[in-house]
Structures are given as C-alpha cells and as structure tokens.
Amino acid sequence: MWGYSPALDIQLEVNKSATNCLGECLEVLIVGAGDARHIVKTLASSYLYRDRIITYHVIESTLEQVARSMLLLSTCLEKDLGLQEATRYYLEIYGNTLVRPATAKYLVKHSDRLMDIPTNTIDCTWLSLENFKRRDKDRLEGIFKFWERATRENIPVVEYWDQRVRKSLKTRYDYRDGVFDWDYHMVLKSRDVSNLTVQEYRFWRNNGIAFTWLEGEPARSNPTLVSNIIQHGPGFIHYAYLGDITNGPFFTWGSEEVKINQNKYRATDIAEREIMRSIHEIRTKEPLCDELIASHRDSSILNGTLMIEMPSNAMEQESWKRERNKYRKDDIPWIDIKNQKVIFHPVTSLETLKCKTEYTSKFDFMWIAHNMTKQLPNLIPLVKKGAIVLVELRKYLVELREEDLENFVKELRDIGRKNGLREISDINAKKHYIAKFYKC
C-alpha cells in the first residue's frame, strides 16, 4: 500500500545523467511503486524545468493500489481543498487505519466521484485507464463503491490490523512493545532513520496509525487499506488487511532529517511539510516559503512528544447514512495539468509489453520496486539505449538483516549485467535506498 524509498523528482534524475537524450518528450515507466509519490514529486517540480511532455506509464500489482494512486493524485490536484486540508487528507488516507471524521467525509464524497472515472462518466484528462479490460474497469468501479460504503459503515480495520499483528508475533504478542522497540533501536536507527521517533513507530506497529496531529481524533476506519475487494451480489467480499505491519509508510515522504532552531521534527512533520510543498507547487508553480509551513504547525508537537489514545469503541462503530453526492458531470474538480498524463497498465503488462513493437525501446526512464526485480528481463527491452533505470533497495525493510541487504544488491548486480545494465554509481546496501543504472 506504500513504498519503501523517498519520492523522487524524475526530471532531476534524468537531467543528472549525461547518458540520456533530453528530448521534448519524456516517457516514464514506474513499476510497483505502491503509491503515486514519484508522480506527485515530479509534477510539483515541473516548474523548475523547461516545458516537456511527460507520460507516466504505471504498473501496480493490484487494482487496489491503482485505485489508491488515483485517489491520492486526485487529492493533490483538487482545486477546492485548502492547502493544509489536502495535505492531511493525503497523509491520513495514505498511512492510517483510522482517519478523522472530516477525512472520512471527504473519502465518502470523493470515492463517489472517482467511481465514475472507469465508466468514462466524467472527463479526467490527466488519467487514462484505456489499457484495462472491461472486467478490470468494473472491479475498479467496485473498489470505489466499497470504499464509499465501508467508510460510512466503519468496517473494523483496526481489528483486521490486530489480527495480523497477533498472527505475526504469536507468543510474543503480550510483549509486543519490546519487540517494536528492538526493531526501532537495533534496526532502523542503525540505517540512518533520524526523524522517525520511537513513539510514532510503536504507535503505528500497535494500531496502524502513522500520522497524528493535536487537532481532531482519528475515529473512522480507512477502507482503502483493505485487500482483494470483490463485488458479490449487492455486497462485497474482501481479504481484510494483508499489507505491511513491520516497516511503515514513513520512508516515502518523512525520512529527510530536518532541524530548525535545534528542534527535531517527527516523521509526521517532515511528511506534512513535503506533501504541503508539493501540493502548493503543483497549484502555483512557485516554491513554498518556510513561513507558510510554520504557520500550519503547532510548536508543542516538536521533539516527538505528541501521543494520542485510541478512540472509544462506541465512537469507532458509529455508522453514517448514505447520502448521494450530487455534482455536475461537467464540473471538473481538478486543476489543469498541461503536458503530463498518467497511464495505468494491468499487471499482465509485465509479461505482454515486451511482445508489442510499439513498446520496444520506448521509455527514457524506468523506476522499479524492490519486489519486482525478477521482472527486469521482461522490462529492460522496453527502455531505450542510454535510459536511466532506478531500482528500489531494501534499506528500510525491518525484517531483513545486513546480510540480506548485501545479498539483494549482489543478485541485483547479476541480473543487471545479464540484461545490459551498468551501474551509474557504486551501490551501498546499508546506506542507499536506490540503485542507479543505465542501459548500455
């Protein structure tokens, strides 16, 4: 449901390399990112570069991840949301099992709108689902319907989370805080994770709530984290929560170390700052000043001191009635994005694109997740000679030890060499979160 490396400005990565041709068009392939962070970051930074047509081709392993990426991108692009409002909606939906009531109401309303995209009922110029078959489009529509209904009915996502934790820890469940503290101090701290506090990490491991603020209590379930959603008659079946319960969503936006006036910010504060900056830059094409960021921040939350309690069961189980959200089909809620478009491809494309001549040597840049590296032989034919290929490393995976990190890098080097990739720079398994190659 999220990635394990920071958001990247793709144009910056391309421009840094002299091996790549800097043309008027940039064709990008993103495989298994788990979220839309690289697209958001690149959109935000576009004003820093000359005009260029950028097409993002995205392959995710599940339709739920496609739907979440659509929702998160839509939140960044929605023109009627306040800056802080959009930022916190994004982070809560992205990384929390429970969200504030205001966020839940937004999720209900927005899911109702997004379910019309797969059916082409509303025009969404920045997004294309044309490569999906009718069956997959129907499933996407069903996922949005499920989110709308499940948010109102407040399905017990925290219970699903606890069941996963119990199954994972078994006899160690009663001593879980000790397990979480050990993972934090002995693993994460040794890998240069600076702004993530032990309080944030422990609270997330216990309850699945990563990002918290003083204002508002997270009391409504976030069904966008539920896996394998299938419409069945008038209702739905799903596999509860099957996602990450050990690493966390902190490393995509909240891993940069920042100190101001000797105050050390939490991962939540860094993530809020980075998302706020990205949304502001997408909207205004201007940098965000630090004073504006500071105006949204309460000084009492510095130094990782903020702790929250879980809401009462009665509050969590309260149900909402369905109210059909009325909006005009020609009322476009998103800001106009010129020269950039996101095209989603089905997961079967991992095997089929190499057989289509129009995709041979098509891409100038490829980013691939750490758990998709076995697909490199299928994907390398799709990139141009001299293209940049970035591969996510496993630095932030808590369950892996240093030996595992080194073995992964060794295997990655072997796969790369066999498929015509050369390292742009040396790879340090413990320090680096990304490996950089080019196609020779």
Model region roles, listed by residue range:
Residues 1-440:
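Domain-level detector for long C-terminal conserved domains
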